[in-house]
């Protein structure tokens, strides 16, 4: 993968993260929580309507998670723009370390909470970032050999 393509893919993944986080925050602010109610219900199959996003605790956790996603997306975008663009090895290392740390802790805790499906949902999200980094790293290594 060309470096410019990897940069565009990482910017896209960052913006997608920001949008997903903003959707969670807006759901809390507006009270339009139905899409997230379905999402949480899907975490604990079968789809039976038992999970919700209605209590104060659930709403504040959604707000916190959304804010963290927005913050991570902004940070990933800045790392991509100011570090990865000029130093793909360093920028890729920073992003990869953060993403793998998130993936392992989030997935392990989700599994422990009985929401094993979240591990499956986390995986494509992780790959949105890791695939461009890895393919660019592989291309750079092949060009330098």
Q: How would you name each of these model-derived features?
A:
Residues 27, 53-59, 77-90:
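Short juxtamembrane and helix-loop transition motifs at transmembrane-helix boundaries
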Residues 43-44, 124-136:
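Alpha-helical transmembrane segments and their membrane-interface exit regions
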Residues 64-83:
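Transmembrane alpha-helical segments in integral membrane proteins
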Residues 104-121:
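Membrane-helix boundary connector in multi-pass membrane proteins
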Residues 1-3, 137-145:
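Short, charged juxtamembrane terminal tails flanking transmembrane helices
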Residues 1-27:
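Cytosolic juxtamembrane helix and N-cap/initiation of the first transmembrane helix
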Residues 19-60:
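Membrane-helix boundary elements
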